[in-house]
Amino acid sequence: MKRHPFIILLSLVTIFVMILTACAAPTPAPTEKPAEPAQPAETKAPEPEKPSLPAFDKACTPDDEGTVKPVDMQPDKPMKIAVLGLENNPFWIPVKEGTMKAAEELKPYGVTVDWIVPGDQHTAEVFGGAIEAAVAQEYDAIATIAGDAGVAPFMDKAVGAGIPVATFNSETATPNKRAFFVGADLYLQGQTACKAMAEAIGGKGKVAIITGFFAVEAHELRRTGFVDECKKSFPDIEVVGEVENLDKGDTAYTQAQDFMSANPDLVGIYVTAGGPFGAAAAVEDAGKAGKVWVVSFDFVEETMQFVDKGVIYATIGQDPFAQGHDPAIRLFNYLVGDVVPECGRLVTRADIVTKKNIADFWTPK
């Protein structure tokens, strides 16, 4: 039987495909590469915790007030400390001198201490803004006056960002996260001032009060301390008026004149803050030295001159040099050496200077 050529061709193609399939090498199945052992993640050693700070209200007067030394330890990197103060009256001159001394002592350790004056008033707007600026400029620590309660949230925010904050000279009674305070017991100073006034005027008579700022909590503590003590212990002392002089001597001069004109029988003027020499000058110019007594604070040159003349009966100190010096040193010691102040409120000495003992505290220039 004759085969069709197409069938023969199809058979040949089929046989050829079968031969190729049989001869093809089998493709090995893919094999998975064994997984490499997991490498442990790099872990950064946690920062050691700082020691606990003393209780906010625990008070003491340290033996090394004004002379505290830096710990002899080199920090890991250069550091910056901001000290926020004022220069609106002569009181601040020795405060700044204290800060400059601290800067000199800390310089060998690679620490820069900057004295910064953000304005001429103690307000939260001024000093809160200055604290925010110091945080933005990456200061390692901040020391500030805090006489306005509104400053507290700014301090707490800085501490929350890892920057310790200390206060000096004046602070709010509102609890906050500041590390420590260096300055006077202001309410007690007001009480002491009342006792000095009572001694000067024989425990009775009309007295006027010139405060720095009613809005500054520190000045209010001195004012209320005076008023409360006089009411309690010397009820025959009558406060005839209270004004604020914004820490200015020339304003105190005019206010003292006004008080003496309105009250011819005035026997005392109590100045809680800056500018007492202005009130004393008004008393002297009115010819009433020894009849109208001034009681004040601080040992600035002009004030001491009027103590020496017998116009200011007593002026009460607060160690301004220590207030400017100690915060920067103690902040450094805390950051670098974990040295914690012994108290939360490091109360400065409150020496009382009168004409009788002025030679122990002042030499005329």
Model-derived regions: residue spans:
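Structural motif
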Residues: 64-68, 111-137, 241-262, 276-279
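Hydrophobic alpha-helical segments within soluble ligand-binding/sensing domains
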Residues: 60-69, 181-207, 221, 252-253, ...
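Short, solvent-exposed amphipathic alpha-helices that sit
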Residues: 91-107, 189-193, 217-237, 251, ...
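Hinge/cleft segment of the Venus flytrap/periplasmic-binding protein
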Residues: 44-77, 218, 229, 233, ...
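Flexible loop/hinge segments that line or gate small-molecule binding clefts
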Residues: 149-188, 206, 300-308, 312-313, ...
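Hydrophobic alpha-helical
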Residues: 144-160, 226, 244-304
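Bacterial lipoprotein signal-peptidase II cleavage site
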Residues: 20-32
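Extracytoplasmic "Venus flytrap"
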Residues: 56-75, 79-98, 102, 106, ...
